[in-house]
Amino acid sequence: MAERLNVLFLCTGNSARSILAEALLNRLGEGRFRAWSAGSMPRGEVNPHAFPLTRALGFSDEEFRSKPWDEFAVAGAPRLDFVITVCDNAAGEVCPIWPGQPISAHWGIPDPAAATGTEAEIAVAFREAARQLRNRIDLLLALPMAKLDRMSLQRGVRDIGETADGASE
């Protein structure tokens, strides 16, 4: 595997979960990873409730945009090592053929953008999604990448998505 690993997080709308995952891995990966996000049917704008969480990680709002996954399946796109879906709809869709045959996995997270209620209740839903994503990203970061063959790494990344909320036991 390359020294710096490239990860694409996918979601249908690319407005909340995948954006949060991109921000978290770019911050927590400390240069070992480069993350992006995209959607099969991007909403065209990031959900405003995601911004307080990305700002808390030290990012500006302008660093994120809702974009189609096709941008990553064309010549000149970054070579992807991992493609991870974070919503059930994207997991069931036919994805583009990614150059380089990246390792794929599904880490289902409830959609905070579907939360209703007061601003405080919606903020709680976004924080909970970010917590679950962070738990899974922490597990990804703990994998001994250099010591695992491709099949073991595939299994390890997929197993992360099968933990109840990403918490290690």
Regions found by a protein language model. Give the residues of each.
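Short polar/charged helix/loop
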Residues: 2-169
